[in-house]
Amino acid sequence: MIYLRSSLLRSGLARDPARLCSQCFSRLSPSRRPVAVRSFFSSSRLRAGIADHESTPSTVQKTYFSANRTADGLLASLSAVNSSPRSIADNALSQGAASSESITSQSTSQELPHRRRKRLKEEAAKNNAAETELPPDASSQLSTLSSALPATSLRRKLAAFLALTKPRLSFLIVLTTTSAYGMYPISSLLTLDPSMTPLPTLSTSTLTFLYLTTGTFLSSCSANTLNMLLEPKYDALMSRTRNRPLVRGLLSRRAAVLFAIATAAAGLGLLYIGTNPTTTALSASNICLYAFVYTPLKRISVINTWVGAVVGGIPPLMGWTAAAGQTATTGHDSWRDMLFSKDSIGGWLLGGILFAWQFPHFNALSYMIREEYKAAGYRMLAWTNPAANARVALRYSLLMFPFSVGLWWVGVVGNGFLVGSTAANGWLVKEAYKFWRHQGANGSARRLFWASIWQLPILLVGGLVTKKGLWDGVWNNVFGQPVEDEDDYLWEDEDEVAEAERKMIPAKTSSS
């Protein structure tokens, strides 16, 4: 039996029947079929036994007479042989994928606890790697407005200088200062003795309020300008601050320095003239603390957040001491009397509220832009220790409750403030708890930030509305509570006068 060379079995040659003769194809046939010879003596049963499984075509075709008809079966067998490795490979791949999936599921089910925690932590970090960018602050918006104006325009310069002041932050400081001024108890004014000190009239209290408002705003402008002067290089690395006037070159450093000095001198001068030296000293200390302690400390230690909270807690004390200065008597108007007397407790409680509020507000803000703080080199808990960042926010949110209750306890506000402050503080604590629970993920940081934005004005306005003694007369008239009869005071005055006259008559007779 003669076999073909192995080269003839290659797929390329097998697919080209023109290069092989009929004898070679017949030898390559997998099963050699016996030739059916037509005979008069062969029956149909014998012919059926001789024929193979392939049925004879019912009609005579051209290929029936071809000598190479066996090539058809041979080519079909060769193509099946050539395609079999591919099918085997595909089956192997599908089986391998199925086995890998089963192995993966089995390994996941048998995953060790510490590896599972690590995997979940990495997945959470990937899902929450980037927060939505915050909108630009007021300084950036004013810088954009200034850059769009002509270079010689006066409006361009005014917008650039106003951008140095951080208008929103300055407005918040003025709001907290004037709120404390307005919450100073009316009872202190009612108990004054006109013979000892003149009562403050509407004109003097209004002037004091204007001096306090203007002086506080100018002092805040100076502190914010000094802050921008000390870190333009780092402001350029953050999206929220890279559009500030000194970063963009809208103002020179010399102009910014002169502006900071001028606003500080004007602000402190107005506070000294219109309020008292204690309020002026508090404002000056706040400028120095913010510009020369807090600003450089941001690149050194995470303690900068606590220093910044102290800066935020001083303005309510300024408003309280400004109001206390109007009722201070001669010899009782020193800084010790205004800051450490019994009447100063309300001011310290308001300062404590602002101190505690800084942490949920700033920790949520810093978490949303933690990568920018990290790139700029600012040491913030948001990226150095995110877990502690969330814990601190929750802890100081809870501290808002005792400070608010303390204002009611010492008689600064009425019962309505107790209800309103509990609701507002409860909202803040709820968002702070979610921020701690989710570690800033799932939008909890943004919700806490906006909750703090709304909670503080609600608290301050609520304190002004429910101020102790402000609505007593209205409350009594509406709810019909009995009012002490004025006739009782008249009868008491007549009795006192009659008794005094009886005492004076014997004295006159004895002298005569």
Curated annotation (Swiss-Prot):
Ranges annotated as spanning the membrane: 171-191, 207-229, 255-275, 300-320, 345-365, 399-419, 448-468
One Pfam family it belongs to: UbiA
Known catalytic reactions: heme b + (2E,6E)-farnesyl diphosphate + H2O = Fe(II)-heme o + diphosphate
Entry's Gene Ontology molecular function annotations: protoheme IX farnesyltransferase activity
Any one GO cellular component localisation term in the record: mitochondrion
EC number: 2.5.1.141
Main location: mitochondrion
Superkingdom of the organism of origin: Eukaryota
Record's bilayer topology term: Multi-pass membrane protein
PROSITE patterns linked: UBIA
Keywords for this protein: Heme biosynthesis, Membrane, Mitochondrion, Transferase, Transit peptide, Transmembrane, Transmembrane helix
NCBIfam families the UniProt entry points to: cyoE_ctaB
Biological role stated in the UniProt entry: Converts protoheme IX and farnesyl diphosphate to heme O.
Entries under HAMAP family matching the protein: CyoE_CtaB (MF_00154)
Family membership: Belongs to the UbiA prenyltransferase family.
Name of this protein: Protoheme IX farnesyltransferase, mitochondrial
Source organism per UniProt: Aspergillus fumigatus (strain ATCC MYA-4609 / CBS 101355 / FGSC A1100 / Af293) (Neosartorya fumigata)
Phylogenetic classification of the source organism: Eukaryota, Fungi, Dikarya, Ascomycota, Pezizomycotina
